[in-house]
UniProtKB/Swiss-Prot annotation:
Gene3D superfamilies: Spermidine synthase, tetramerisation domain, Vaccinia Virus protein VP39
Organism: Thermoanaerobacter pseudethanolicus (strain ATCC 33223 / 39E)
Binding, spermidine: 62, 86, 155-158
Main localization category: cytoplasm
UniProt pathway: Amine and polyamine biosynthesis; spermidine biosynthesis; spermidine from putrescine: step 1/1
Keyword Cytoplasm: yes
Protein name: Polyamine aminopropyltransferase
Amino acid sequence: MELWFTENQDENLRFSLKVKETLVVEKTPYQHLAILDTYQFGRVLTLDGILQTTEKDEFVYHEMIVHVPLFTHKNPKSVLIVGGGDGGSVREVLKHPSVERVVLAEIDEAVVRNSKKYLPTISQALDDPRVEIMIGDGIKYVNEHKNEFDVVIVDSTDPIGPAVGLFTSDFYKAVYECLKEDGIIVAQTESPFIYGKLINKLSKMFKEIYPITKAYIATIPTYPGSLWTFTMGSKKYDPEEVDINSIPRIDTKYYTPEIHKAAFVLPKFVKDIFDEV
């Protein structure tokens, strides 16, 4: 008998993967977690039936949410990651030799624990001595820390369940205070094909708070619509003014200096979503 995982991406759209083996299923205090081994995309992490990451294409998301802001900042030493308990963003952050401290604020310890056990290629950096894992509410952590981080990465799930509070103006204002005077925030801001209204709303929030607000894109096959957006808010540095010739080559599969520049060239319909008043 064939076993398939199916994600209901919205009321009219489903995405399915054929499953080799169910590795773990756990009902945590916050959500329903499963890690499955699939034929096409390797091991995958799902939360509440929504695909979070896969071994085959995770590098696109993690490289783009990390390297674009960290190479925009002139000298990132301290980085806060809100969410991201699978460890992929931590792995990418630690490719930057200037980084001295990474705080991972993850609300659900089961995500960290199971990722370490079943997703070693993604979670491999979580035991690095520069990493502090804070199991708890990332919003509360942000509110309690002022002028502390060079870069804040909001590596959240979709805007449902535990992540709802990470898509609010109050949270982005708190991040502004959490950042140093030349700090940068980047957040994953969903698919323009599915969440156009939300993206426009978030863009307006960022523009009200951060003097420099830019959107960029990447293609992630297993995410709804495949085309994915990220929104960056910066107090000082413009990501489009980075001299790409000065960006050092690091070990990546998707991100390059050329991709850094190209990612900010938005299709017209995406630009319209971000620019609509």
